[in-house]
From Swiss-Prot:
UniProt feature coiled coil, ranges: none
Upper classification of the organism: Bacteria, Pseudomonadati, Pseudomonadota, Gammaproteobacteria, Pseudomonadales
Recorded family membership: Belongs to the LpxK family.
Gene that this sequence comes from: lpxK
Annotated organism of origin: Stutzerimonas stutzeri (strain A1501) (Pseudomonas stutzeri)
Keyword Lipid metabolism: yes
Protein's name in the database: Tetraacyldisaccharide 4'-kinase
Pathway: Glycolipid biosynthesis; lipid IV(A) biosynthesis; lipid IV(A) from (3R)-3-hydroxytetradecanoyl-[acyl-carrier-protein] and UDP-N-acetyl-alpha-D-glucosamine: step 6/6
Alphabetical GO biological process terms: lipid A biosynthetic process; lipopolysaccharide core region biosynthetic process
EC number(s) reported in the record: 2.7.1.130
Length: 334
């Protein structure tokens, strides 16, 4: 188990040694709060785009189902006739230049796995750059857009925003409620009181704290051909190799179990790069991975490898609320 994995386990399950990190946590909180205060007190330090910007992010380290929800937001806006673009940091990407416009045919190493997945699924204009304000400017120079979604970037205050959506894993919550490195929080818990909406992945119902959304499996897709298979493609009890290089791989393995399969889990680091040798497992069984991993494995995937396609399903109340926000932000287009 890596140091990062040990830390995550301690954050969510508790460990007395975390108290030794309290001085570093205090320093981290002071830096984060001072940085945020600087941007709030001087609006000139942030770039405000000529179109509304919606930030979709986390205050916790690790996976919360952000990419599926961004896909839902994109498709929902597109169904309403809105021209939507996306900016992303492009984590682990090595583009030839910055900012970099992501195309569906680009290799994952140029784009990052999540931006490439988003473009391949939706065709949306997407620009990557750690400087998200610069990414927005570049995107608007190329495309006439009505709305921009920022994939993550809640803490990137150089980009002014009109709406902040924060996602939390309902099962793990905020862990021990402490900031890095003593806990999983990028910002103090009080930050949740300042955002526009909180969404809980896996919650049974809406609460006063926020809206519920779920990730529902819709089918399997073969990597080598793109053929779609129904969820009953494998019978109940089928043993298979399960590959996940995401922030919370256990959630993927649990999902496969809810489909009555018997996954042999193979967890990799978030945003991991793969080689064919890494994915040679024994015994020979069907292999199922996440869609995020699939964009990096299509080039060498043999017949039979597939990914589980999921879709975000937000609560009716959130859909109504979000439509109201779109009408407020874009009154001429509603």
């Amino acid at each position: 188990m890596s140091v990062a994995e040990r830390l995550q386990r301690a954050w969510y399950q508790g460990h007395p040694a975390l108290c030794l990190l309290a001085p570093l946590e205090l320093l981290y909180r002071r830096v984060v709060e001072a940085r945020r205060r600087r941007f709030l007190e001087d609006p000139n330090t942030s770039y405000r785009a000529p179109v509304p910007v919606v930030v979709v992010g986390n205050i916790t380290v690790g996976g919360t189902g952000k990419t599926p929800l961004i896909l839902w937001l994109i498709e929902h806006c597109q169904r309403r006739g809105l021209r939507v673009g996306v900016v992303s940091r492009g984590y682990a990407a090595e583009p030839p230049t910055l900012p970099w416009r992501v195309r569906a045919e680009h290799p994952a190493q140029h784009c990052g796995d999540e931006p490439l997945l988003i473009v391949q699924r939706t065709g949306v204009p997407l620009m990557i750059d750690p400087d998200r304000a610069r990414a927005v400017r570049a995107l608007l120079q190329q495309e006439p857009l009505d709305l921009i979604l920022s994939d993550d970037g809640l803490q990137h205050y150089r980009l002014a925003r009109d709406l902040e959506l924060v996602l939390i894993d309902a099962a793990r919550g905020l862990g021990n409620g402490r900031c890095l490195p003593a806990g999983p929080l990028r910002e103090p818990p009080e930050r949740l009181g300042e955002v526009d909406a909180v969404l809980f992945n896996g919650a049974a119902a809406d609460t006063v704290e926020g809206y519920a959304f779920s990730l529902q499996p819709v089918g399997l897709v073969e990597l080598s051909t793109g053929r779609r298979w129904p969820l009953d493609h494998y019978p109940a009890g089928q043993q298979l190799h399960a590959v996940a290089g995401i922030g919370n791989p256990q959630r993927f393995f649990d999902t496969l179990e809810t489909l009555h399969w018997r996954p042999i889990p193979h967890a990799f680091a978030d945003h991991a790069d793969y080689s064919p040798e890494q994915l040679k497992f024994s015994p020979e069984l069907p292999l199922v991975m996440t869609e995020k991993d699939a964009v990096k494995c299509r080039a060498f995937a043999p017949p039979g490898w597939s990914y589980l396609q999921v879709q975000a399903v937000p609560s009716t109340a959130f859909v109504t609320w979000f439509d109201d926000q779109l009408a407020r932000l874009l009154p001429d287009l509603s």
